[in-house]
């Protein structure tokens, strides 16, 4: 049986980064992933790749706190991993009647500790979006928003974790977790892995992992967005 200090369940961006950070210490770490590679089966393989500034999170929530902290951590992390981070900024645009909503987002961002946040008019908007519809009058400009390739980032995190000694178990869906003699015994595919501690980073499957150990149940709410690519003519009508 393979025995470790910590087993991380889930090979998305969260699981890969947790494993990478844990291998900075004198710990024997395993990462268990149900797919054939990291960033293959979950949200990390296909999302917008935005490193959010943190203005859209409710004030006082854990999400708001870690969002702003994470945004500040990414430049140094990407430099270390050799992953491109594009600090393009973000615009939340609106018509005249949307100005109160934009102000609310601004105030929320300031309360969350977001830096370089301002409300701008068409003169600034047109510098970034020259074909924007004439009805657009205002925008919230978040200069700290960036974009990144989520799968390249996940792969880079996992590669550094591997170089630091993390062991990976792919094609290994966790089916059972039992507490025996002070350790967790994890049955995953053809593998039985024991660990002193388990980190649940299974993303959309995290609630099911919790159920396997009888831990607190929590609801998951899923959302799916759509992105549209428009030609120059189409943009003018949005």
Where are these regions (language model features)?
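N-terminal Rossmann-like FAD-binding beta1-loop-alpha1 element of flavoenzymes
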Residues: 4-31
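Glycine-rich FAD pyrophosphate-binding loop
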Residues: 23-45
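Short loop/edge segments at beta-strand edges and connector loops
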Residues: 33, 87, 120-122, 170-172, ...
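Short, flexible, mixed-charge acidic loops at enzyme active sites
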Residues: 42-49, 132
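Dinucleotide-binding Rossmann-like beta1-alpha1 core, especially the glycine-rich loop
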Residues: 48-128, 137
């Amino acid at each position: 049986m393979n025995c470790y200090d910590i087993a991380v369940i889930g090979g998305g961006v969260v699981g890969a980064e947790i494993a990478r950070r844990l291998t900075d210490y004198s710990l024997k770490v395993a990462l268990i992933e149900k797919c054939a590679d990291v960033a293959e089966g979950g949200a990390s393989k296909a999302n917008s790749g935005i490193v959010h500034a943190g203005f859209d999170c409710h004030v006082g929530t854990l999400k708001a706190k870690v969002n702003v902290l994470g945004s500040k951590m990414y430049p140094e992390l990407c430099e270390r991993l050799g992953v491109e981070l594009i600090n393009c900024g973000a615009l939340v645009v609106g018509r005249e009647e949307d100005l109160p909503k934009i102000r609310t987002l601004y105030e929320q961002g300031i309360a969350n500790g977001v830096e370089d946040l301002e409300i701008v008019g068409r003169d600034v908007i047109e510098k970034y979006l020259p074909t924007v519809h004439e009805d657009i009058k205002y925008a919230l400009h978040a200069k700290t928003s960036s974009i990144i390739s989520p799968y390249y980032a996940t792969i880079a995190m996992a590669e550094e974790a591997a170089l630091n000694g993390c062991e990976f178990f792919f094609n290994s869906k966790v089916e059972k977790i039992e507490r025996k003699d002070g350790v967790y015994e994890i049955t995953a595919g053809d593998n039985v892995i024991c660990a002193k501690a388990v980190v649940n980073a299974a993303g959309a499957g995290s609630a099911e992992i919790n159920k396997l150990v009888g831990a607190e149940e929590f609801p998951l709410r899923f959302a799916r967005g759509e992105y549209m690519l428009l030609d120059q003519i189409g943009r003018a009508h949005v």
